[in-house]
Amino acid sequence: MRRILQLTLASALILLPAWLSAQDAHHDHASGAHGGERQGVVHFPNSGARAAQQPFLHGVALLHNFEYDDARAAFRDAERADSGFAMAYWGEALTFAQLLWGLDYADSARATLAKLGPTKEQRLARAGSPRERLYGAAVEALFEASDLPTRTHAYSTGLRALTKAYPSDLEARALLAVSLLFDRSGTPAEEQARTEESIRLARSVLSAQPDHPGGAHYLIHAADNPRYAPRALAAARAYSRIAPDAEHALHMPSHIFVQVGAWDDVISSNERAWAASRAWVKSHGVAPTELSFHTLVWLQYGYLQQGRFPAARALIDTAHAVLAGIDWNTSDVIDARYAEEQLRFAYARESGDWNVYGGRVPALAARNARDSSDRTALFASVDAYQVAFVAALVGDTAQANTIAATFRPRAVVARDEIAALVARARGDTATWIAQLQGAAKDDETRVHGGPPFAFPPHELLGDALLAAGRPKEAIAAYEKSLELMPNRTNAKQGLARARRAAGVTAERPRSSSAPARS
């Protein structure tokens, strides 16, 4: 019974519009950056004054590392050193396009551009060279008054023109590589083609310049799913050495390590990144909401996969302690707002210890009405699912159904899984299994990136089939789950149980250092 109570959602990503995918959920971090001197090496010939060179180049490296706050400060230093240096303003504007994180501060970017000139034409006229004008045209396209898909497509188009005119420009090639990941339009085949191109571009940058931060970083992003992850293992092992002062660079390798189930490496990466995040917050004297709670969530996931449950549970207490006293009516840092409940749910889901909820249904986290970002929508959707799940678990099927009724139309997997939980609570085994079969089928069309906010549906289906005395079918479900998310401990243990129940002999799965659960 304890195992059955671990039923959860396969991926919170299904709760969002089509263009917001796994990378938005799992490539997000605290809003603060953590940029020291060692950020990798960039070569960017430009027209700026001598005094502007160091801050500008440092800003470009920080931008490649997604250390947005510190990159912005560096570009502003370059502007102060040379007020007519257009590239510094275009660089600063890009720090507001945190699009892989689901954050788009276009108004702030436009305010930055206005410092350079009141119109696009006047700003482009201040470019120091034809090459810089092409950079400017791409950035200007990203912040036109249009919808985001149109803007990101125009940005990629501008960067493609730049790389065609200047094929040896590694900075342009790197920016094009990551820009292709912003574009979620078109068919699955078209999206796959963009991913393949992004991988090729990033690898070519890294091959030409092994210490380039963008080459390693963007290759990890592009390859962040089980199909492509092996192609980025070398980059994952190199990135933290390329930019050891970037907290993001310490964390990012774990995106690949999770995809191949390398739990020791996941833990090592995120222990270092969490320590760097805490050091940055302390040294800058900023609020603890600026901590990288994304890193903390990934660290806990590594602990959970190795069965280190006391260490994993302690991180719930860590989040609670560092966020004590925060006024959530004024703070709009989304990762911090939802951190404790994310950690609590993940712990219960992986360990089977639902006592962390004390037998009560948690309240939906209060949302800050000022923040309407896609990232906020993602976290609110995840929170709603988790509350609905716990409600069904304790038998409050009415509340579970009420919350599920608010899910977006595209939230097929979420809706099916809540319906399955409700059916199980009512003793309807046939509907329980049928709903999970539907969820599992739909999930096979989705990209799986990073730790799940909840259980993959094939694991849920395997649990249900095993409980219903259908172990051979459960074997297939667990095997499919491991194909989609390699080396997950719960799937491996479920598979072993199903094989025993079916009388199937098989080689013992590799150990994940996790103890078996009853």
Spans of model-derived segments:
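Inter-helical turn/loop elements of alpha-helical hairpins
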Residues: 65-73, 92-129, 137-150, 183-193, ...
